[in-house]
Amino acid sequence: MASTRRSTSAAGVCARAAGESMSDRLRRYAEEGARRDEHPAITFRDGPTGRRAGLIGGPDVWEVAMWLDDLGPGDDRAAELAADGVVSRPQIDAVLAYRAAYPEEIEARIDLHRADTAAAEAR
């Protein structure tokens, strides 16, 4: 078992490397840990636009949410998306639950993607 001192030191090194204070890093760990407890199929990952929620072993939550939106109105968009085979029905259900809990976060990610895509297409 690793000592608390070594773990705290490693967290401090990681925080400094990421440009975070130790207290910011610990606050983020607590927030993400609480969200993982609430949504066990969800993890968090770094990327060029910051940290975001993603399916464990799968795409980002916002991507799956956007795919569902892009299917338009329908009786069972989740079943339709699952039939494509990219994500399973349990993964889609996990995305829907996370989106219901944190709608502003997911909508902001979708909006950012759509704005970036529109800007790239305009070039």
Where are these regions (language model features)?
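Short Lys/Arg-enriched helix C-cap and helix-to-coil transition segments
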Residues: 39-45, 105-115
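Short, basic interhelical loop/turn and adjoining N-cap
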Residues: 20-21, 82-94
